[in-house]
């Protein structure tokens, strides 16, 4: 899909196709054991899966207070919310014609659910009240290609654009609200590989403990550390296993990084991050798998478990298909 003409209807198939091509070009898979979810007895109060509305076509997931979750739709731009312990969902943000949501991130300071996506050919970043569903900010990103994921830091919202080699930044005020300024951009330089047309580059994004950013690359593979001030990007060396491929969403819990690889194998790669000689190093810890995973796109951590939303990209009947969240044991 050309970056200048994003299509809601073709989004899922195009996304799957781009990542699958990357996986086919790289035959290496993560070394280390694949951990099936065999420890569910430790969380008897939590379900193995959480049902989502049929036809939702989910992609982004984030978690709020307690066991509250939020999931966005790539097909109609709605956000649904519910409890990971079960009990159904409700619509937080109503659908809108032409709107497509991708990454979501809940900011506990403000109770806002931030979302990236598009309305037709326009790229947007939204802030939605996590209780009422009111849209408190709608930031137009001029020149955007394919906004994909985001992270909220102390003074900014950073977001990836999978078709452009840059990160976007929305300034926040001291209260964690949008400061009302136009987005700024930082070009990805250094070791970052150029993103070819009709492929996906930067995808998942999280903030490291030193204030730098970690991103993955859906086509070229690897984990990458970005200096947010200069854009200089260095690949994070992976030990005890080959570099990851086909990454989508990222989750960082302490020093453990989870790389969701839906189209690359329907699993979650696990890494232990540490600084060594002034650079970040990732030690492969294996993979999380489960029979109920079906092209997971993103995940969130809540109630001691990792929760992966199954986007099911490539399903022949996406507008009527069943969708669900899979619980995975953290390790």
Which residues are covered by each model-predicted region?
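Conserved beta-strand positions in repeat-built beta-propeller and related beta-rich domains
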Residues: 70-76, 107, 113-121, 158-163, ...
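Surface-exposed loop and turn segments in beta-propeller and other repeat-based domains
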Residues: 45-48, 95-96, 181-197, 237-241, ...
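Hydrophobic alpha-helical segments and helix pairs
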Residues: 130-185
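Short loop/turn segments that connect beta-strands within beta-propeller blades
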Residues: 83-87, 129-133, 173-175, 227-231, ...
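A short helix->beta-strand "capping" segment at the edge of beta-propeller domains
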Residues: 40-55
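Beta-rich, blade/repeat-based domains predominating
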Residues: 53-69, 96-117, 141-158, 191-212, ...
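N-terminal secretory signal peptides
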Residues: 1-13, 21-29, 38
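Beta-propeller blade signature
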Residues: 127, 322-330
